[in-house]
Every structure is written in structure tokens, then in C-alpha cells.
UniProtKB/Swiss-Prot annotation:
It holds the Pfam family DHHA1. GO terms for biological process: alanyl-tRNA aminoacylation; negative regulation of DNA-templated transcription. One of its GO terms (cellular component) is cytosol. This is Alanine--tRNA ligase. CDD domains: AlaRS_core. Its cofactor is Zn(2+). Its main location: cytoplasm.
Amino acid sequence: MKSSEIRQKFLQFFQSKGHTIVPSASLVPGNDPTLLFTNSGMVQFKDVFTGKETRSYTRATSSQRSVRAGGKHNDLENVGYTARHHTFFEMLGNFSFGDYFKRDAIQYAWELLTQVYKLPAEKLWVTVYQEDDQAYDIWATEVGVPRERIIRIGDNKGSRYASDNFWQMADTGPCGPCSEIFYDHGPDVWGGPPGSPEEDGDRYIEIWNLVFMQFERDAAGNMTPLPKPCVDTGMGLERIAAVLQGVHSNYEIDLFQNLIRAAARETGVTNLEDNSLKVIADHIRACAFLIVDGVIPSNEGRGYVLRRIVRRALRHGYKLGQTKPFFYKLVPDLVAEMGQAYPELTQAAERVAQVLKQEEERFGETLEHGMKILDGALAGVPAGGQLDGTTLFTLYDTYGFPVDLTADICRERNVEVDMAGFDAAMARQRDQARAAGKFKMAEGLSYEGADTRFEGYEKLELDGVKVAALYVDGTQVERVQAGQHAVVVLDATPFYAESGGQVGDTGLLESGGARFAVADTLKIQAGVFGHHGVLESGSLAVGDTLLARVDAVRRARTVRNHSATHLMHKALRQVLGAHVQQRGSLVDPDKTRFDFAHDAPLSAEQIAQVEAIVNAEVLANQPTQARVMAYDDAVKGGAMALFGEKYGDTVRVLDIGFSRELCGGTHVSRTGDIGLFKIVAEGGVAAGVRRVEAITGDNALAWVQNQNALLLRAAGMLRTTPADLPERLAQVQEQLRTLEKDLEQARGKLAASAGNDLAAKAAEVKGVKVLAASLGDIDPKALRGMVDNLKDRLKSAVVLLASAGGDGKISLVGGVTADLTGRVKAGDLVGFVAGQVGGKGGGRPDMAMGGGNDAQALPAAVASVQGWVDERL
């Protein structure tokens, strides 16, 4: 039975039991900052299990794409060396949200395994939690599993409820016993049943885990029965495929064998058992699907995990002798295997291959050099020894070797790595970076009052606000005097505090004779706004009542740029593709600067398309709408959650024209308020990240007017109209090319004429003609032509010509005819003269060039040539 058929039969079976088939969630958890990657089927249902969210169904089934690499769940170092470790795997699961419980879950599992997949019942063993008599009885009396094949597992991890058969989401919250199903590979394979001393052997392999969430655990460890118990099950597709296909290693199943053959094809390897092929076959799955879900290789977070996996695959390709990009060529093979089950892979295949190829080319430049450094270092380390932390860090910092990649190589050679030394070197670098950094917000502002009430969405002026706290030089004070720089915390404010890329507001705080100029607004902690500025007059004390007034003109320019950013983000996705995701932004009164995931520069046509789309939305003058709702409802409604951002349970959804994003910033009331949108710059800021700068409103109008003025000025200089300027410029360019050609011909004639005059000045040294001369300001190219001409005229000669320009720079050209290069070399001659005029030179035996900058020394240097030649003849 093929892997694709196993997956399909699983989903269809549970669909027939009233389950809704739910598509795989992204590998990037949508709303769980505690997880680096989605690593199980229950992740997308976490809030349903905890009661924070409800769905339209109470039964679900899915095939969840999962990754375990980096963070707590990290299988990377074992991949390729064991039968069942993977970075990427598929978790088949069925779930009940307060619907059925143990009886149905157990019976469904048994029916699928024995009647649909037709596994021999006598090959199946099960485990239950020691105290879970209900599950034990269902297995024994209702399903009919012999009691000798039902094993109770107690608290085998050192504390109460710490057991392989007791699951808990965290220290507190939903938890409960679980029942695991094992397959017996038979007595020919070493190992014992679960719970025995030999349980780590490969004879009994876990294929399915049924989790029964029936308790709520509090901080004191007390267990309270849940009013609606739930079921969460997980069965690895790769493991069940190995069982159903009669193989012992996951890498022997059809899906992996096809990828291994593809890897062998691209690396030229014939031994399909090579572990490096297994590594490559595993890693292409993880890398491709991470890119599909918006992760790109980088030096931090999820992007760095992806980079580590890619580079580990490339190192194994290098080990197999492949030094050219090959990894990206496996994408079509992966699409053939998994594209039908996951259409998103097929849709993004070209993009995936492009990202992988670029990463291969980037790392390929340093891989060979890094391997030479590592090989040299390991040559001096005996088996069982240790590679020093300094070398580890050099490979990481200079050659881009992730430390686990170096450790992988060392392990193959039975060498340990000095992680303590590496960590120390890394810490030193971080300390240096911190020392060099400058932080905008003073650290250590302690505030224990209520959060600031923000009213700046509707108001730019707010009277009657109270001073809640004052800070001078980081210290909390009761009063501020005129002339002092301070931070003011208010109970309420119309000032927006810098967040989400939008700069903070400026303006005034006034009361009687007190006037505080706000230069910036920043959060001193979550929910607390600090107004930074200087008290221009009067005094200010805690408890004072003020009028807070935002600089309305500056705010208006800022919100125009912010709203335009949303429209531009949407337009970029339309023009370039759905892979475009925000990587950073800065919105201030002057511009919007937007960083996004994309690999290639934008063409002029693409920029024009984006501008046209945004300005069409501006002209439509649609009203904007902001709503507060649950995060999951927002995402279901099509709101874009920005990559890498963390959101609370409740979010603000902003509709601007055709854009819908989660955003807490300030915006225009109607799209027409943006006025005009213009992109003024585009470039790269990092690997796979582009930056666009754009302006709006009066800034955009001023830019257009300035460009028009430049156009009119240029047209006037060429005595034409702006409309005819391109044609006129083409004419001027053609005229320039003709003049340059004529000039070149004139220079050639001049050189020939000068050569005729110089030839007569050649001296004879031991029967050899020697000519050395300084000619004033002559182009180096013309100088070389003159040397060639003189060599032809003199037939057998040594020639050195020099020119000194008005800027003091000296050009030297030396030539030696072929019959003399055995005794006199042009490169040596030019080097000798250049050394006397403060420069360097060199070249071939028959022709060489050089230069210098000491014009005063040039006459003596030229005069020394005859003596130098005489010494060599």
C-alpha cells in the first residue's frame, strides 16, 4: 500500500465516522509563541482543547505537516543515522472535542488497523496508564486484545503522573492518560515489549498514540475531571507506512525510496544505502515545506533553523562529491510524491527551487574553504579528542557553518566538540555588539500604576489628562522644572506610542504656565506610554491636569504613509506572489520603508504595477474600518497576520480598500486621504529580503514636481521638449560615440607620430636599443599603443614610457621584444621604475604596466633605465 493511499484511507475512514477533514496547518504556528514549529496534529486545535475557541464541528481528522528541528523538539543530529528520526514528518490524527471518548477512540483505531489496513491482530500490543482501568477493560473485554499483550505503564519518570502513558499540555491545564499501540516485528528483531528492560530495541515499534484528556490540573497538582473530555490521537505516516509495506526502516518506504533515488541521481551515487542520501531525502521535505509556509533562510529564529537544515544537506552532498548546486533539483521529485496531497507545494514549487538554489550558491562559496579549515584542524585531533571552541566559532562566524553541522562532521570522525569554548566566543561577540549598540529607551524605568488609556484613534487633543509618573535621567521624580528633559506618563493620551513600525507622535502637553514639548512617544512597558521631551516653561508635578495635543500635521503625514503601506503590501503580493511577507517596516511622516521576503530586484514594470494598484485604491476613496475581534475569527475572515508577530487573543482588524490586516496603528479615514502614492527607492537589505521606500500626499506631490522640474531643465539644455527628450538623448549618445571613435583614431595617429620621433632617440646598450622617456599627460591606453608601435619599429629593444598627469599620478608602460625576454623582463623593469616613484607595477615578460605618485622622482627614475638594462645584458 503506497504512502499516499495510506494517508487517503486514514482520512476517508474518519470522515465516514462523522469527522471533518481539516487541512494541515502551517508549519509556522499561527498563534503560539511557545512553539518554533508545528510538531503535532493537535497544535492547530490547542485553543479548542483549552476551551478558548469553538469550532463548527466536534470531530476532526487531519494529516498534519510537522517539523522537529531546533528548540525543545530537535531530531536533527539523528536524522540519517537511525531508522525513524526525521526533521519533517506527517502526523495522521483524529480528534474529539467533547464528543466521543475512550471507547469510540479505541474501537476506531482497532477497526482501522485490522479491517482497513488489515494488520494481523496478533501483531499488535497496547499500553495503558497504570490507573486507567477503563481503557484496560475496553481493550481487553470489548476489543478482545489478550491481557498478556496489554501492558500497564506507571509513573516511570520520577514523579506523580510523570509517565510515558500520561500526557499533559503544560504544568497546568488539560491532561490525561494515553494508550499507545505497538507493532511487533517478530523474534528476528532484537528488543522487548514496552516497559521491559529491552524496550529500546526495534522489535516493538509504537505506531499510534491515543490521548484521553479528562482532567484539569491546577498549580497545586490537583486533578479535576473535565466537563467535556477530549481525544487527541497521532500516528506517524512514515511509521505506519513502514509496517504496511513490510520494511523495518522508514527510509525504505516508497516515498523515501523515490526521493533517495532522486538524490542519488543528482549526486552521482550508486549505493542507495548511503546515509548521506537519507539525510538529503529527509531534508528536502523539511526545507521545501518551510519555504512554502513563508520561512526563508536567515541568521535568526526559524530562518536559521531552515539554513541549518539546508547546509547540513549540502554538506552531505559535498561528502558524496557534489560541489555544484544540486539540492534544488529535487523539488520536482518532491512535488511528484507529495504535491497531490498538499497543493500548496505544487503552487510554490518554482519559488521553493529558487530559494534553495540561491542558498546553495551562497553557501557553496564558503563550504569548500570551511571544509579545508576543518580538515586541517581535525588533522591534529586524535580519535576521542576534542575540537576547540575557537575553531568552532570561526567556522560558524566566518564560513557560515552551523555548530551542529560541524559537530555532525566531528562525530563521524569520533571527535568531541568544545561547546563551552564556542559559547564563550559567542558570548564575547554578543557583548561587543551590545556595547556598540545605542538604545532609544532608557532602561530601568519602573512603573507600577495602571496602563495608559489610548484615545488617539479618535482624538488628537485630550483635555483633563493626569500626570501619573515623571522620570528624569531614568529616575522617578515628583516634579520637573523648566529646562529639564523628562519622560511623562499620563493616565490617558491621544499620543500614539511607537509600535508595529509606526513612529511615536510628537506634540505638546500644557497646563497654565507649563509647556512640555513631546519629541517622541514610546512604551516604557506593555500598555504604558512614555512621552519623551523637554519642559520648555513652568513646572510639572505628578497629579497635575494637562491638555495633551498631538502635532496634527505630522500625524496626518504618518497615517497616510501607514495606510499606504497596507495597500502596498497587498499589491506586492498580487504582483510578485503570495510568498511576499513583511520582514520589517518603518512608517514616519516622510516615508514608508517596507522590507519583505523576495529574492530578486523589482523591475521597473513591476514597480509601475504596484503603484497603479495602490493609486487605484486611493482613487476609489473607500472608507476604512477598524474592528476588534478574536484572533482566530480575524484569521478566518481573511486578515493577514504578519510573519513573526505575536498577537493576543483579541486583535484589531483593519480594512483599507482591498487590504485586511491585523494592526494597532493609526490610519486614514478613507483611502482617498492618502492623496498620491509613489515608490522612490527599491533595493536589497539581506539575503531574500528586499526593501521598498515610498511617499504619499504632499511629499509625493513635491517629489513629482521636482522630477518634472528636472525633466524640463534637461529638455531645455538639449533644446527640445520633454516628450522628445528620449529621442534627443539617443541622438546625443550616437554623436558622442562617433566623437569618441574619432578621438581614438586621432590618438592612434598621434601615438604613431610620436613613436616615429621617439625611435630616433633610442640609445644602444651592449648592442641592444634602449628607449626610456617621460611624455607628459598621455592616456595609459595610448601609452601602451606607443610602446607596441616602438617595439615594432625598433625590432629588438627595451622600451619604457611614462606619463604624468596634472593630478600627480604617474602611468608606466614597459615593453621588451621577444628576442630579449630571456635576459630582460618587462615586469621587472616596470617594477624597478615604479618603486622609485612610490608605486607598484608588473606584468608579462614582454609587456607590463605600473604607476606611482611621486612626480618629482620621475626624471631620475627614467634616467636609471639604461643602467638597469646594462646590468642584465
